[in-house]
Curated annotation (Swiss-Prot):
Pathway: Bacterial outer membrane biogenesis; enterobacterial common antigen biosynthesis. It comes from the Bacteria. GO terms for molecular function: lipopolysaccharide N-acetylmannosaminouronosyltransferase activity. Its EC number is 2.4.1.180. Disulfide bonds: none annotated. This is UDP-N-acetyl-D-mannosaminuronic acid transferase. InterPro entries: UDP-ManNAcA_Trfase_WecG, WecG_TagA_CpsF. The gene is wecG.
Length: 246
């Protein structure tokens, strides 16, 4: 196994997080020696760590996921503070999803999509086929009942999908991925939140300069002032960070 196919783990609040150096390292890790890994990818930011701290069910879902990675700049900075020798960079979930789709298109990996509004999902599929020739073997928008879940899992299993991405928000997407894996275990699952909306232009992401400065959170706050209540929760995370309680 090549060095790029391995990655160190760094513990924050008792959760082991993968430390990728950059996007290339992430892709080489997930496609180690040409073999796509199986398991669940979960993006970890400060807000998700706070939720995991307060909600035992969410913590159990996150802890059970094989591939927890640093999606938020706050988490990256905390890893660097706690582990000064760590060579870890932020790998944003939306960027990782696009890179994963590009690689899947190149290799013909079968992909199944779950979640999103019907029109957004249709636009996502069309763009992925045009842009990277992604082998889409099935999809289901986010409008289905609990009674329809088992039928959906059966469809996913019958499709032979090797990648399943779920855009339902947390913790709904983590719950669905956990349950689907009982029916279709041999795949890589990824919770992607609002990524389909961003990919199709329905939601505007922060400009690159804001992302590069680690200020994407501030851009979202300025664009959506109603997020202030959620952002205030992060003061608790800052206390953890600056007191070394991570």
């Amino acid at each position: 196994m090549t060095n790029n196919a391995a990655a160190p783990l760094y513990s924050l609040r008792g959760l082991p997080l993968i430390g990728w150096r950059d996007m290339s390292h992430a892709l080489n890790y997930l496609f180690a020696d040409g073999q796509l890994k199986q398991g669940t990818l979960v993006a970890i930011n400060a807000e998700k760590l706070l939720t995991a701290e307060d909600n035992p069910e969410v913590r159990a879902l996150i802890a059970a996921a094989e591939f927890k990675y640093a999606d938020g700049i706050s988490v990256v900075r905390s890893i660097r503070k706690k582990f000064p020798q760590a060579q870890v960079s932020r790998v944003a979930g939306a960027d990782l999803w696009e890179a994963l789709m590009a690689r899947a298109g190149k290799e013909g990996t079968p992909v199944f999509f779950v979640g999103g509004k019907p029109e957004v999902l249709a636009q996502t599929e069309a763009k992925l086929r045009t842009q990277w020739n992604v082998n889409i073997v099935g999809s289901q928008d986010g409008y289905f009942t609990p009674e329809q879940r088992q039928a959906l899992f059966a469809r996913i299993h019958a499709s032979g999908a090797k990648i399943v991405t779920v855009a339902m928000g947390s913790p709904k997407q983590e719950l669905l991925m956990r349950d689907c894996r009982e029916v279709h275990p041999h795949a890589l699952y990824m919770g992607v939140g609002g990524t389909y909306d961003v990919f199709t232009g329905h939601v505007k992401r922060a400009p690159k300069i804001w992302q590069n400065l680690g200020l994407e959170w501030l851009y979202r706050l300025l664009s959506q002032p109603k997020r202030i209540t959620r952002q205030m929760r992060l003061l608790r995370y800052l206390r953890w960070h600056y007191t070394g309680d991570l």
